């Protein structure tokens, strides 16, 4: 998810590292961009904001945006996906599972300079059956992110624990809810170094249906999720940086399409998925007394993969592409193994 919109222009521009010769001309350019729709913005004017901010300001903005994407949204989306893909038959058994997901991303915006990010997320979970209609579970998430900013670098380490419950209203409909909390440790490296910590909370509600037509399975789902990342204050060289808390409300809609067939004792289930995330939330970064705003962006995600079931073991492999207004390349791949008992 992208966290900065082209039409959102910061209240002021930090020029501590790069001083244009004519400040009046710069402010006129920024004002002109704010009054024009995206399609009408000249490329040279749209680039003025990103080019004008200092290295420290650019790094703080980029880190805030990357944290919103990977911490608030990726973790919640992966949990929603796990809950949605649990079948009614799974509710009659207990299971343990582990998944590993790799993300590769490139970001660009008129308010921060282009950067790339690599992230690895590992999740360990347990699902327990309480009755033929009720299932509960717990998920522990650990992720490590490496960012390459313009003349700077960043690193995030994130740990979060979630609990969920899923109730089947009948053979098709289900409702599920989850809640979790976590901790984010961050490091920024320009010519100076800064270390700081933030906390996270998440909660979500999902409603879905499983339609079975012979060997075909169609699983539509919809939900709402609230995610919050706390504020942070830190020093980056001579600059005092204040990052406001970021709260994101997400409306989700997803559709999974699968076909199940057998090859001997092995069950094969190819799977295609599409999901839409409507994200609402704004945050801010203050560097040296000058404020810059950013906001959550809507996303679409498309996935393809397959599940292999042999006795009580399931292996899932899938790849995804995520699109948004300012997402250049967003690709991920996941492998997941589950054991039922």
Where are these regions (language model features)?
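Outer-membrane translocation/initiation segment of Type V secreted surface proteins
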Residues: 1-124, 132
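Membrane translocator/pore-forming domains, dominated by Gram-negative outer-membrane beta-barrels
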Residues: 43, 51, 55, 93-95, ...
């Amino acid at each position: 998810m992208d966290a900065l919109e082209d039409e959102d222009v910061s209240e002021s521009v930090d020029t501590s590292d790069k001083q244009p010769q004519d400040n009046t001309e710069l402010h006129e350019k920024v004002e002109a961009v704010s009054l024009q729709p995206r399609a009408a913005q000249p490329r040279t004017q749209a680039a003025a904001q990103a080019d004008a901010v200092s290295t420290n300001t650019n790094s703080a903005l980029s880190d805030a945006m990357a944290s919103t994407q990977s911490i608030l949204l990726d973790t919640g989306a992966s949990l929603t996906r796990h809950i949605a893909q649990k079948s009614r038959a799974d509710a009659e058994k207990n299971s343990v599972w582990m998944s590993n997901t790799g993300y590769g991303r490139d970001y660009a915006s008129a308010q921060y300079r282009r950067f790339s990010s690599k992230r690895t997320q590992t999740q360990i979970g347990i699902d327990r059956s309480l009755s033929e209609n009720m299932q509960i579970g717990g998920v522990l998430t650990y992720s490590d992110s490496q960012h390459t900013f313009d003349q700077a670098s960043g690193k995030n380490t994130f740990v979060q624990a979630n609990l969920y419950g899923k109730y089947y209203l009948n053979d098709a409909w289900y409702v599920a809810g989850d809640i979790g909390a976590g901790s984010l440790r961050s490091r920024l490296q320009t010519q100076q170094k800064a270390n700081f910590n933030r906390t996270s909370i998440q909660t979500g509600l999902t409603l879905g249906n499983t339609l079975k037509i012979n060997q075909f399975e169609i699983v539509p789902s919809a939900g709402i999720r609230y995610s919050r990342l706390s504020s942070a204050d830190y020093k980056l060289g001579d600059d005092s940086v204040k990052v406001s808390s970021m709260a994101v409300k997400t409306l989700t809609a997803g559709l999974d399409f699968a076909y199940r067939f057998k090859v001997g004792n092995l069950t094969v289930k190819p799977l295609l998925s599409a999901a839409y995330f409507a994200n609402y939330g704004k945050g801010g970064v203050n560097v040296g007394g000058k404020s810059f705003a950013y906001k959550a962006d809507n996303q679409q995600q498309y996935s393809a993969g397959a599940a292999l079931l042999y006795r009580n073991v399931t292996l899932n492999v899938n790849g995804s592409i995520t699109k948004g207004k300012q997402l250049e390349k967003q690709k991920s791949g996941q492998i997941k193994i589950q054991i039922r008992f």
